[in-house]
């Protein structure tokens, strides 16, 4: 066979013309730092494993000790959680640089103070599996149970379920099992590209955000790796400079992999600090979490063939459509739980399904839905704290460009309306001019409370339908 027919690998990818990433603020490159938090989840007979750990430590070429504890190896890993993590935490928080943590669930459970610090810093915590072990020969049903248990422990310890998954020491089944779990916005067990890409999974499209084994401090613990911090810095700088130069035409992402027990050592940490400062000295750089990258890609780069809601996992569906109804993702969740079909793969069909889901809400939920909406040309608009959708909608009707007299009139009508009904005036402004909106205020102020509640809910459905039409593909 000379072609790709029937060949299960994609050797072509984006080819000679990759998509234009469109990172925020015209960034040439997205530089993303990952801290792997594995200490306390590694192979150890205390954890029910057959032997001691032998991977990624100061003891290059170490071998497992069957049935025995390896005290030197244990203390090397302990350095990562006791000292190395906190050095990295200070380094990134002092510079206000976002981080994604690949956190092993059992390691998280053994150092909740570190997890609290991750949350306090606003870092993304993705799951790094249940245990930091080699899954190569693990039966798929066992690995699936481990993934499920990792999500359970992670959610309990971190306070929220992980939306990213990186097993690391993976099996041939890992990626499929991650896609089957259904709750991950991205999987990262790939090193195949400089950009995210879509795979068609067993439950619909799955975003892959490739990771790195080259721009990674693990090479301090590998043959022919980095022997000094200067080598690490030079490699990271060359990687950044190349991608920054390319990025004016074809922006990419640069992942940097870190380990608390490796680069957390003082002699290596200095080189990392120099590199972070070097990146910060450039203007057109975006420094996101991996979840930020995934969400950006989902918004701007749908999978081939566009979005088919009936083929989306609940997590991806809510990510895409959870903001269709203002601050009310429960409507998207209810619509997905009710079951989606080919009929809902159009904007009109999905709008009907989501309106039906909203109608199923309790009176309290509907009241909260109405209250979730901002005043038109109100204080939130002036403070520029509206949602992206509301900002665009109000701008389309010219409500961001009011004269002082117009602003005073809108303010008076907003106040009068709230005083009468106890909730904000809601109208699908994309359908209307400023004059239409002002006339609507005057007309609806005469309604009774029940009629106006029904009118507000109908307008909310109309707003949602218009938003759905604006979603690409």
Where are these regions (language model features)?
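C-terminal non-catalytic interaction appendages of large macromolecular assemblies
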Residues: 402, 406-473
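Residue-level signal for inorganic ion chemistry
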Residues: 328-329, 425
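Charged, compositionally biased N-terminal leader segments and the immediate start
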Residues: 306-326
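A structural motif
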Residues: 202-219
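A non-catalytic, amphipathic alpha-helix used as a structural packing/dimerization or gating element
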Residues: 87, 145, 149, 235-238, ...
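Catalytic alpha-helical scaffold of carbohydrate-active enzymes acting on polysaccharides/glycoconjugates
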Residues: 2-207, 233-256, 262-305
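C-terminal amphipathic alpha-helical segment
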Residues: 221-232
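Aromatic-anchored, charged helix-turn/loop surface patch used as a conserved interaction hotspot
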Residues: 323, 329, 333-413, 463-472
């Amino acid at each position: 066979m000379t072609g790709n027919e029937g060949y299960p690998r994609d050797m072509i990818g984006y080819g000679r013309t990759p998509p234009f990433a469109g990172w925020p603020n015209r960034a040439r490159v997205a530089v993303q730092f990952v801290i792997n938090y594995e200490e306390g989840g590694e192979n150890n007979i205390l954890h029910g494993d057959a032997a001691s750990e032998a991977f990624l430590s100061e003891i290059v070429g170490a071998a497992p000790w069957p049935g025995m504890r390896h005290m030197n190896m244990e203390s090397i890993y302990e350095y990562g959680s006791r000292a190395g993590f906190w050095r990295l935490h200070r380094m990134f928080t002092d510079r206000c640089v976002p981080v994604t943590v690949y956190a092993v669930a059992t390691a998280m459970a053994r150092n909740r103070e570190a997890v609290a610090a991750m949350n306090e810093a606003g870092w993304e915590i993705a799951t790094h599996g249940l245990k930091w072990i080699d899954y190569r020969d693990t039966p798929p049903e066992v690995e699936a149970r481990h993934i499920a248990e990792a999500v359970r422990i992670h959610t309990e310890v971190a306070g929220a379920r992980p939306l990213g998954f990186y097993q690391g020491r993976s099996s041939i089944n890992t990626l499929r099992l991650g896609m089957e779990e259904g709750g991950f916005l991205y999987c990262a067990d790939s090193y195949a590209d400089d950009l995210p890409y879509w795979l068609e999974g067993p439950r619909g499209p799955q975003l892959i955000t490739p990771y790195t084994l080259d721009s990674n401090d693990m090479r301090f613990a590998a043959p022919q790796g980095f022997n000094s911090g200067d080598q690490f810095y030079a490699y990271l700088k060359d990687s950044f400079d190349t991608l920054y130069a390319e990025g004016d035409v074809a922006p990419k992402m640069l992942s940097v992999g870190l380990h608390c027990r490796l680069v957390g050592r003082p002699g290596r940490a200095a080189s990392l600090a120099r590199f972070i400062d070097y990146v910060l000295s450039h203007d057109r750089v975006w420094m996101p979490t991996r979840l930020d990258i995934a969400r950006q890609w989902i918004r701007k780069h749908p999978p081939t063939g566009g979005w088919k809601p009936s083929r989306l996992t609940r997590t991806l569906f809510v990510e895409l459509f959870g903001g269709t109804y203002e601050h009310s993702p429960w409507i998207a969740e209810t619509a997905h739980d009710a079951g989606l079909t080919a009929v809902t793969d159009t904007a009109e069909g999905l709008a009907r399904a989501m309106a039906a889901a909203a109608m199923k809400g309790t009176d309290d939920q509907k009241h909260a839905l109405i209250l979730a909406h901002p005043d038109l040309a109100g204080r939130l608009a002036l403070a520029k704290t509206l949602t992206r959708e509301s900002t665009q909608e109000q701008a389309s009707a010219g409500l961001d460009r009011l004269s002082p007299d117009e602003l005073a009139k809108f303010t008076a009508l907003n106040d009068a309306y709230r005083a009468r009904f106890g909730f904000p005036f809601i109208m699908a402004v994309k359908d209307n001019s400023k004059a239409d909106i002002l006339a609507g205020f005057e007309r609806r102020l005469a309604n009774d409370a029940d009629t106006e509640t029904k009118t507000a809910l109908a307008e909310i459905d109309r707003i949602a339908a218009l938003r759905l039409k604006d979603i690409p593909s």
